[in-house]
Every structure is written in structure tokens, then in C-alpha cells.
Amino acid sequence: MKVVFTMGGITHYLSPLLDNVVRKGVDVVMVIPSVKDNQTIGKGVKLVNNEALYQVRYSEIKQGWYGKTILTDLKTILNEEKPDIVVLGWPYFLQYFFDRQLRLLIKENNIKLIIREIPFQVPPFGQLSYFKENPVYDENMILQSRGMSFFIRALCTMYIRKFVYKHADATINYASCAYDILPSYGVNKDKIFVTYNTPNTESLIRLREKVLSAPPLLEKKQRILHIGRLVKWKRVDLLIDAYAKICPNYPDSELTIIGNGPEMENLQYQAENLGLTGRVVFVGAIYDPFTLGQYMHESSIYVLAGMGGLSINEAMCYSLPVICSVCDGTEKDLIQDGVNGYYFESGNADSLAKSIEYLLRNPQMMKAFGDVSLKKIQEEINLDTVS
């Protein structure tokens, strides 16, 4: 069986997943832009270009009249590769809607169509009121879900999704919230396949064994850890505010922030103004997996105060309890409130501080939560189960 995937680029976590799919007997062809497509790959996201078991085909791109990227060579590649399945994600499934020739090519060649998305910021069909409780912000925390033009685009996108999903043979989704959302677009639940998103957990757990046997890197403390690019929508400022509320009660605690980004100076200034110099440690970016593993192993709690990614999975590989808010939906399949972490009220520093303090006061609970985190990775959401 041959499958063509369309992506904006090959991320460091996607590559081992695709290799694993190939090992299971699937011929995989990745179609990616010949230049980085910033519309589909966020700033600072690490891309790879190394040897792999799957094939890579490059396509020229252009911006469609509707403002999103088009893979101009996609039809040619499909004609040449003759796949059994084509997998289209955002924004490339818009190309399926607007390009009648692409639709005919897929139909005439009996190519099965699969749509792939989280879904994130996708309301149930017809429910524009969704955006009142789930406002859309960009990376700089500027509100996007306002004004007539936004809601007209959102309504049009709903109908486009409904059309595309009607013609899809199946969907691949990263989060189980797909079971609640996609049926409103006419998708039968038996066509929805949740595969979750994961880093290379096999590699991480092997590395963990080496980290466990290595001498400590850091002074022993109750360490609260955050890893991620320092941009506004990660809400590291909220985490610092929350820590300021509890740190006087925990003199042996430390907030460690790993990552670089445009908000670094602002966050350092915030910590200094709150009297947290020496208590909030900005490490900068760490690219060495072993060193990163040491930081996770020698921490007590992992906190994601805003939008996140696979850092939750990675922290769970190191038996960490996780505190987060509801973000893109993927966290709901990883973190069970009161079992291996806590959810706090989004944007509420008091709520976040309360969750952190509760775990700091209960080290046995931290240990139990961390054990559940690791078990969930080992048994449920790992490289093998999602591929």
C-alpha cells in the first residue's frame, strides 16, 4: 500500500513516526514545499532533512486567491506516484475544495482521501458561538476572533470543511475531541481514527535509562519546569506570576524555564520586578537531548501555562506530573485531572498557583502522579501505538 502525505515540512517528531509506518509495511511518500511554508509550520519549529525510510517529494508553492498555500505540483506527483491513499491536512485540503481537477484526479484514480487535523479551533458545525468561549489568539496573544470578516471566514470554512469531510473516506486526528466535533460535519464515527501526537518515545525512554544512571547535573530542589519557545501565547508570564504567589512558602523551590524567544527580556524583567532573581532561572534553549533529559529528571513538576506541544509527552516520559490549562485538545488525552496532573483555569494565576502549591505540599502525590504519566506513555500513547 502506498500513502502520500502532504505537510508543510518534516518535523523532528514526525520523521521517526513515518519511519515506523514504513517498517510496518506501508510505502510512504511525503510531499512538502520546496521552501519552508510559514503558514503551516510555526516559527522556531525544528525541521529535519536527514536520511529516512520514507520518500520525500518537493513541490513548488504559491498563495491561492483565498490566502492559503497551494502545492502546485501535487497533481503531477499523484499522477506519478499513483498512491492508494492521499492524506491532506490544513491548509492543503482547501486545495481539494477549490481545485476541481484535483478532485477529479483523486476520484478517477480511485485514490482514497483522508483528512488529517487535530482538530484545533474547529467549532461544531454551525456554532459560531463557540468562539465566545474559545477565543482565537495569534502567537502574540492578539485576538483574532472579532469583527465581521472573521466570522464570515469562519462560516465559509465550516461549509468548506463539511464538503471536504463529505468526500473523505476517513479522518486522522490527534485528539479524541474529534469524536465530538466531526460528526456535526457529517463524518461517521467509524471513519474517525485518533492516532494522537507523539515524539520518539522509544528514544526518550532509552535515553531516560542513561539519565537515571548519570550523576546529578543540578542542585537538588523542588524544581518547577517549563520548556518551550518564549512567545506570548505560551503564557510564561502567567507562570511567573503564579510562582511569585507561592515561592515565599517554599524556599527550596525554583522555577526553571528552558527556551529562547522574543519574550526573553520581558520575562526576565518581570521576574526581577517581582523579586524573583535567583528563584526563576532562565536556562535558554537546550538542544542536547541528554541534558534536557537531566533537567526533566531532576524536576518535580512540569507546567504548561499556555499553548503547548509535545513537551507534555516528553515530561511524562520522565515521570513528571503535569499542570496545564485546556489548550489545543491534545492535552485531554494525556492528562487526567487528579490522576497524573491538574488543570487550572485558563489565564488565572491564582488557579495555577493553587495547583502548583498543592503538589509541592504533597510529594507522595507528585510521585504517584509521575508514575501514572510514565505508564500512560509506555502503554497508551507512544511511537508504536500511534503508527
Residue ranges and their predicted role:
Residues 4, 216-234, 238-243, 256:
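Conserved donor-binding/catalytic core segment of Leloir-type glycosyltransferases
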Residues 313-317, 327-338, 342-343:
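Short acidic/histidine- and often glycine-rich active-site loop of Leloir-type glycosyltransferases
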Residues 285, 337-338, 342-349, 358-364:
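Conserved acidic donor-binding segment of nucleotide-sugar-dependent glycosyltransferases
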Residues 150-213, 314:
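Donor nucleotide-sugar binding/catalytic pocket of nucleotide-sugar-dependent glycosyltransferases
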Residues 252, 279, 351, 358, ...:
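A short, well-ordered alpha-helix in the C-terminal region of glycosyltransferases
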Residues 285, 292-299, 315-316:
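Short alpha-helical donor nucleotide-sugar binding micro-motif in glycosyltransferases
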Residues 294-307, 320-321:
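Acidic donor-binding loop of glycosyltransferase active sites
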Residues 265-286:
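Nucleotide-activated donor-binding/catalytic signature segment of Leloir-type glycosyltransferases, i.e.
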